[in-house]
């Protein structure tokens, strides 16, 4: 039933076209209305002032001036909207003309209607589907259902118990119940907490949370945690693996790691329904974007000023994700989109003939502050003769075609300002073709065994070449060189000699400088570009000590490249979609500090077990390449659960009696949504119709009553009597130590 104020507000806004979600003007577009009042839209404010009741309710006079009570208006809209924490525009992204969604308009402008929302993202079911119920209020329907259920139950008792009879009774009961409850199915509806509403709830949602179940894992096994180790600047120095909702965990970590993380890599659920992770990977389009937005916003605050974030995605949401990240990190801080060639995924069934085979994924790369960013040079490697063949097959001319046979006599010409100039008047040079003929060697052998003699020349401009041209202008025969110690670059601090053709002063570049030798093979090194097609995505089963995670694993080589490019030893790496633990495992092997967050139960069977094997020295993945010998440690902890515990208890119920008993406990011990009618449900739970519903459907109805704001225990409330049993004294002490919080008097 509408309140008087609701009615007055509805009437007052009828003349304003923008604030209605439907043509009938029966549903207010709450987000649009709030956006307008926050901008102090003169038309809206005028309409509110024009109604005496609304004026009295939402304005206060201060020194003769009427001041709009924005907070009160927000709270009013929240309190009187459908389901309170749900919005009228739930699970929908729109293309708008500024007033209406695309389906109502022919003009197109991309818009995210949930830009002011927070998606909690309770990822507890793999299928991403939920069932909800709409009760039919007709008394005649209720009587009919009761009679039908009674008859069905009587018949089932009198007949012999057989499968066919049981199925018949079940069908009869279900059909009867369906007359009383309309059963509806939808993609799982994520809960939105609108930031412009119910600020007390939002503050509680993002409060620092207490931790429980601390454990330290070392080469000696699992141990108790005695302290939280710290760097000299006070930042925790522990490798951390945290179980819990990643949005809540990120807000908690921000209290200690704000501006400290050098690299964030995430491989989130792709919104395809095909991901191996047990997330709700069937998010509605806007739900997925909001899910990403909320986490990216808080993750940005953790990044160091010279930090960088890599977000991997497939082509389903790539375009939208890029726009979202442009908004959060600023387009000026966009670096690249890296295309990663993965194993080829086939198309079959209904997709056959309707799409191309999917063989790539994309990584969006953004910096926190592009002006402060420096990416370390990282190289792709290809067997040298294979590289040359591919290079020539592409129609390009291979440049390394000369051989320096012998330098001959070395004459010091001059020494000044830390530079030595030399002349090699008798240097012998020839083409690689003639050298091959004279030495009876194949080009393949020359390119490998004689790579230190194979060269090309270049006229690339540099300050050193300018010195050569100026100081040795008169010398035109043989080779000249300059010897010095560079102050920066890859050879900084080392004595080097650079050679030039005396006639034109072009610089010598030797093939050996572009090669690396591994296991008696020579590989050509090429700076990585935005196409990464050299990383093996197949046969990952041996990585991580045979950790089984079929569709979720990323190659350790992929993470090594990203970590090499963006960090140095000791830097902090964060992955808040940890999954099988690849990021943490690679960071551990590369001596980086890391934080991994995962809320699914498999964190203990996958990520933790994988890291234990890393400590033991497992030799899969990048281990041999980085000479990993084992060692190190990490700390495991969980966000201390409260309503999360209630959720697990609901899921563990075995029959209706368990649910009934538990519901009484829920009302006394746990937080339920403030709009839940406990009295009404206490009556419903006694009805035969409800008890005849499938057990999973009964559980679902109870689960939806839990207040998601209270899934975990806040640090500030962990000593409250209501949370007794959620944490022990050691948990509380370590939680305080983590946040560097003082124990209050009397605690």
Curated annotation (Swiss-Prot):
Domain of life of the organism encoding this protein: Bacteria
Gene3D superfamilies registered for this protein in UniProt: Vaccinia Virus protein VP39
Family membership: Belongs to the N(4)/N(6)-methyltransferase family.
Record PROSITE patterns: N6_MTASE
Region span, Binding of S-adenosyl methionine: 267-270
SUPFAM superfamilies: S-adenosyl-L-methionine-dependent methyltransferases (SSF53335)
Function statement: DNA restriction requires both the Res and Mod subunits.
GO MF annotations, alphabetized: DNA binding; N-methyltransferase activity; site-specific DNA-methyltransferase (adenine-specific) activity
Protein name: Probable type III restriction-modification enzyme HindVI Mod subunit
Entry EC number(s): 2.1.1.72
One biological process term in Gene Ontology: DNA restriction-modification system
UniProt keyword list: DNA-binding, Methyltransferase, Restriction system, S-adenosyl-L-methionine, Transferase
Catalytic reaction(s) noted: a 2'-deoxyadenosine in DNA + S-adenosyl-L-methionine = an N(6)-methyl-2'-deoxyadenosine in DNA + S-adenosyl-L-homocysteine + H(+)
SUBUNIT field: Homodimer, also forms a functional restriction-competent complex with Res.
């Amino acid at each position: 039933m509408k309140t008087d104020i609701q009615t007055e507000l509805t009437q007052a806004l009828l003349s304003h076209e923008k604030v209605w979600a439907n043509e009938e003007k029966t549903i207010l577009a709450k987000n649009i209305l709030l956006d307008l009042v926050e901008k102090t839209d003169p038309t809206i404010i005028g309409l509110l002032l024009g109604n005496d009741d609304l004026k009295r309710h939402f304005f206060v006079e201060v020194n003769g001036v009427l001041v709009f009570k924005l907070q009160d208006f927000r709270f009013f809209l929240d309190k009187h909207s459908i389901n309170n924490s749900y919005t009228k525009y739930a699970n929908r992204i729109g293309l708008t003309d500024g007033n209406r969604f695309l389906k109502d308009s022919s003009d197109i402008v991309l818009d995210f209607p949930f830009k002011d929302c927070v998606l909690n993202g309770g990822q507890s079911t793999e299928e991403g589907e939920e069932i909800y119920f709409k009760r039919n209020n007709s008394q005649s329907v209720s009587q009919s259902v009761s009679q039908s259920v009674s008859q069905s139950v009587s018949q089932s008792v009198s007949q012999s118990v057989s499968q066919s009879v049981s199925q018949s009774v079940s069908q009869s009961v279900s059909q009867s119940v369906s007359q009383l409850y309309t059963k509806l199915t939808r993609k799982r509806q994520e809960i939105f907490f609108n930031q412009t509403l119910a600020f007390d709830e939002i503050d509680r949602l993002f409060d620092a949370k207490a931790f429980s179940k601390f454990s330290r894992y070392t080469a000696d096994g699992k141990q108790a945690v005695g302290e939280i180790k710290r760097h000299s600047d006070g930042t925790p120095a522990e490798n951390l693996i945290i179980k819990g909702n990643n949005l809540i965990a990120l807000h908690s970590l921000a209290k200690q790691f704000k501006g400290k993380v050098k690299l964030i890599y995430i491989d989130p659920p792709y919104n395809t329904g095909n991901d191996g992770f047990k997330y709700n990977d069937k998010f509605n389009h806007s739900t997925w974007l909001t899910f990403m937005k909320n986490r990216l916003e808080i993750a940005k605050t953790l990044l160091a000023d010279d930090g960088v974030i890599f977000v991997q995605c497939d082509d389903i949401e790539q375009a939208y994700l890029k726009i979202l990240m442009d908004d959060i990190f600023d387009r000026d801080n966009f670096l690249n989109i890296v295309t990663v060639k993965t194993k080829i995924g086939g198309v079959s069934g209904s997709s056959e003939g309707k799409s191309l085979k999917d063989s790539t994924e994309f990584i969006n790369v953004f910096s926190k502050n592009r002006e402060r960013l420096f990416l370390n040079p990282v190289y792709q490697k290809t067997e040298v003769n294979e590289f040359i063949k591919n290079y020539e097959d592409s129609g390009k001319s291979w440049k390394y075609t000369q051989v320096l046979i012998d330098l001959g006599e070395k004459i010091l010409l001059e020494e000044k300002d830390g530079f030595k100039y030399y002349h090699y008047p008798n240097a012998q040079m020839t083409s690689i073709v003639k050298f091959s003929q004279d030495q009876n060697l194949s080009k393949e052998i020359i390119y490998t065994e004689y790579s230190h003699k194979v060269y090309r020349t270049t006229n690339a401009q540099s300050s050193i070449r300018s010195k050569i041209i100026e100081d040795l202008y008169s010398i035109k025969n043989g080779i000249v060189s300059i010897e010095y110690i560079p102050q920066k670059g890859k050879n900084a601090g080392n004595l080097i000699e650079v050679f030039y053709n005396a006639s034109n002063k072009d610089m010598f570049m030797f093939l050996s400088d572009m090669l690396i030798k591994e296991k008696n093979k020579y590989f050509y090194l090429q700076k990585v570009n935005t196409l990464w097609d050299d990383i093996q995505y197949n046969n990952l089963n041996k990585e991580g000590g045979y950790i089984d995670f079929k569709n979720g694993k990323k190659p350790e080589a992929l993470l090594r490249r990203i970590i090499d490019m963006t960090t140095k030893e000791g830097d902090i790496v964060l992955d808040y979609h940890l999954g099988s633990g690849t990021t943490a495992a690679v960071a551990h092997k590369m001596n980086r500090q890391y934080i991994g967050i995962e809320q699914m139960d498999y964190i203990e069977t996958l990520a933790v077990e994988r890291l234990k094997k890393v400590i033991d020295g497992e030799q899969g993945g990048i281990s041999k390449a980085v000479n990993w010998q084992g060692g190190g440690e990490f700390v495991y902890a969980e966000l201390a659960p409260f309503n999360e515990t209630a959720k697990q208890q609901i899921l563990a119920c075995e029959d209706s009696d368990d649910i009934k008993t538990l519901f009484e406990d829920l009302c006394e011990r746990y937080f339920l949504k403030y709009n839940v009618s406990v009295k009404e449900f206490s009556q419903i739970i006694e009805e035969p119709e409800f008890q005849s519903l499938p057990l999973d459907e009964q559980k679902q109805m109870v689960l939806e009553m839990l207040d998601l704001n209270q899934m975990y225990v806040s640090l500030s409330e962990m000593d409250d009597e209501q949370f007794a049993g959620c944490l022990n004294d050691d948990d509380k002490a370590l939680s305080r130590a983590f946040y560097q919080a003082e124990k209050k008097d009397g605690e």
